[in-house]
Amino acid sequence: MFCEADIINLNDHPELTERYAQWQHGKWGVSVKAYLDSMAEAKISQSGVPAWYAILDRDGKIIAGLGVIENDFHKRPDLAPNVCAVYVEEGWRKQGLARLLLNHVCGELAKKGIHDAYLITTHENFYERCGWSFHTMVEEDSGKQVRMYHKHTS
């Protein structure tokens, strides 16, 4: 069973930056450069945003991850920061890894004085089970309407 100690902040593991960017790119199609740029910004940011987190298996393979960015490609910049790119590899699902990551990142944001977090998704019910509340529908940059969730971090 994984615990919070198994979550790594990519700032603390520069040797994983390229591999993590490739992994996220493969899941979401966002350019590797965009992930690398965001991770480079995270290294100099004092605010806690952006930030990138992962869980590795015993062999060092990335099995889950997520990020925190200002805006996850939607037209409501006032609803920030955004948890983004939440992904757990199929063979590792239903073991609480996404919930573990979500709780961890909210704790990290709270430590930085950020009291609210948002995320967009097409999923229903999952985020409610993780303690998030449906907030509103928002328009993505593509024009598609998606669900916006909110959570108080502390």
Residue ranges of model-derived segments:
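Short hydrophobic/aromatic beta-strand or adjacent loop that forms the aromatic wall/cage
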Residues: P50, G143-Y149
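Conserved active-site alpha-helix within GNAT-family acetyltransferase domains
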Residues: K111, H115, T121-Q145
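Short, well-ordered beta-strand micro-motif
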Residues: A54-L56, G67, M148-H152
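Conserved beta-strand in the GNAT
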Residues: A54, K61-N71, N82, Y87
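Conserved acetyl-CoA-binding loop-helix of GNAT-fold acetyltransferases
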Residues: A85-V88, K94-G107
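A conserved beta-turn-beta hairpin within the catalytic core of GNAT-like acetyltransferases
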Residues: N71-V83, R93, D141
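Short amphipathic alpha-helix that is part of the acyltransferase structural core
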Residues: M1-M39, K43, S47, W52-L56
